Each structure stands twice: as C-alpha cells, then as structure tokens.
Amino acid sequence: MQQTSEWSCGVTAALMVLDWYGKLGDWNEESLAALRHSLDGTELEGYPGTTLNQAIDIFNGVGGFDIVSTKDYPDGIWLDDIQGWLAEGKPVMICWNDWGGHWQTIIGYDTMGTEETNDDVFLVADSYDTTDHNQDGYGIYPAERLMYNFSMYGAFPESEGGSDMLFLVASPAEG
C-alpha cells in the first residue's frame, strides 16, 4: 500500500496490518486517522503524523486487537523479540527517524544464512517506497543498523509514547 499524503505513513502502516489479518473492510487512511486523539493543546499541536499513542488509538478504535508496544518493554526490544513476533505471523509496526520520522511495517527477517547478526536484514512494507527503481512497497534494511538508529531523537514527548524504539504489534484478540 502506498500512502497518499506526506503525513499518512502511520495510518497506512496500520492499514497494512489490518489487511494482513483480513480485517481491512472499509477502513482507509482518512477513517483510521479520525480514530486518533487530537494533539491540540499539546506541544505537537498541528503535527499531522502519528504518535505511538495515536497508533494505539487506531487499533483500539477498530476493536478486536491485542496490542503489544514500546510501553510494554521499558528496556527496549532487540532482534530476537522482532524475530519472535514474525515467527508467530505478526507484523511489527515501527517508527524511527527514516525520512525525519516514518512508520514502516517489518514483515520479514533474513539471517543471510550466517550465525552473526551484523549481516541480518529486515524486510519492511514501506508505504513511502520511492528510493529504488521498483516501487513495489518493500524495502530491505540492515537489521543492526536500524536497531542502533531506532529513535525519533526526542521528536515525541513521553506523554505521547516517547521517541525511542517505537513499535506496535497488533494481532486479533484471542477469545
């Protein structure tokens, strides 16, 4: 899925997750964006993008999802955490400083057939895939490099979920 505006990577990442689970229905960027709480009256007033708390709002608004996020991992996550969720068939939404702030969805992990992690890569669904000759919506990132730069460098306040290691794993609620 390609985002239709400069600010909509967060809601488009959520759309990708809904689509992955067959829960897309009639949801679109605009309807998901409307589920986010307003940032009016905060230091982010006028910011059109999506904070972690707003991403959580989206899945709570859609309903029927269990959510694991940065808030559940105060000491951060690492490669084995992401690999575990992927092994369970759960895509991992991440927000980091790519493009000055960008949500993407990790959908795969490749060890490159080695024991070391320094050559491992993430496969991401990227709604702003404009940097290669094949706008297919996918990207490949060195896994350790992304993890060591997995920050918004103070762009979001703690009251909105913070700025470091922002991730969200939404999966259909059990039971």
Each language-model region and where it sits:
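Cysteine-nucleophile protease catalytic domains, especially the papain-like/related folds used
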Residues: 1-73, 156, 162-165, 170-175
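Generic ordered-secondary-structure signal
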Residues: 11, 15-18, 24-26, 36, ...
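Short, surface-exposed, charge-dense and proline/glycine-enriched linear segments
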Residues: 55-66, 99-106, 127-137
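Active-site-adjacent substructure of cysteine-protease-like catalytic cores
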Residues: 71-127
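Noncatalytic regulatory segments and standalone regulatory/sensor domains
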Residues: 109-175
